């Protein structure tokens, strides 16, 4: 099909605003799928995606549509993940498009995630088609949404298309708007092969399947291709398009969105954002926008049953083949045995990996407290990247520690603004901007350390706003902070599973809370056990577990007080000796209880 009859577009939306439902309706309207194949959330292939109602991997699909002008067009839809953890995948998918449908729930209005993803689309200079979804709901307020479009997003209200994806209202208007407003792809004059990899999946039988958008030239079976960043060459074994199943084609031409298979063994060989070109007639420069994906959040993952270590390693390797952003390396802990230090794009990514380990591989795992990457400058000028408390040097040789910051967009009902501002300040953040979205809602912009939003920020924000708040974030660099390494000592012995890097001002309250939790789960010993939180050599919080009392005078009949005193003195000496040489054996389930209650 000629390039002028091709349209590439994406759908961006906040979670639950109906993005995947709209995709389903478009597939039905264009008769891409038959009635027999119909099922809700068709493009969300993973059970986890259907269950959580989110899109985790990109899902492209080619549709053919006969427009009112009498021409048949090929519409390539790239269904992208909506969550910030996958923003690089979203950016690469958007770069493969010329237009984007911006979905807004007419009952909810503009949400925090809408803003973040719209910024990504505008960075790529895409044509934006606003769609007001769910107009059939009693709570829908179309006029208010149109006002928000103009006030917050600076998009003309008359451009908005009212629709209901669930009931099929406005679907034809959306298809016509794609053809009229989204420009056709433009091919480079030299017609050399340039294609961008925007995703890849691993197939057990065929190896890596790379998803590509062809910008110029063509890809066909038997062709020798080269990838810019690995500089490796491959022979194309198969290429085709998604309908939504993989359908073989003789070639992919400029403007096409499709896939190719070329004997790649892992997702690391087909990096997202890499440029594909012909090995004999390569293009002179790569397509812009490529960057290495860096994990932002780290956590130790250990098997609950230590004999599952090899099975866990195999499971992680299989997940990594499909997910190049997930990293892991072996580590061991005296408390938890052998496990892995894992890197994730963010909290949702971490949750998804853990859930997939449990579901797809039946692995029972425990994860340590999540940490972030710190930049450390030593007094001798040496720069370090620290993602594990054990790697942090002694305080005496540290010149400066810098922590990662995030820009938070929080959309809340105006009544709760005071509570949320207090929460941001409690988390060491600064509110940089407030904007009234409509008479009832406010958009807060704040800068907060990434480590502070890792665990409970979203949950607390949701409960404070009775579930009406929404948030999204983007990374915004590093800033200096007074971070310290806090160790937990149990009977004088440091336990590395509980070591953490915390802010100096929060160390005492965190240490005290952890000591209390440990006191509740560690069984009593025959001697007094001290649980201490310490920074360097200074103890900042302490709890004690009293000794079990054994009645050594029980066998003394009669009233000989000197005999009883002798036995009690002997017991006292024995306890002191035990305290000096005794080791506290902490059962593994105690660690698991503490780590899980700390989630």
Can you describe what each PLM-predicted range is?
Residues 1-599:
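Structural and coupling elements of P-loop NTPases
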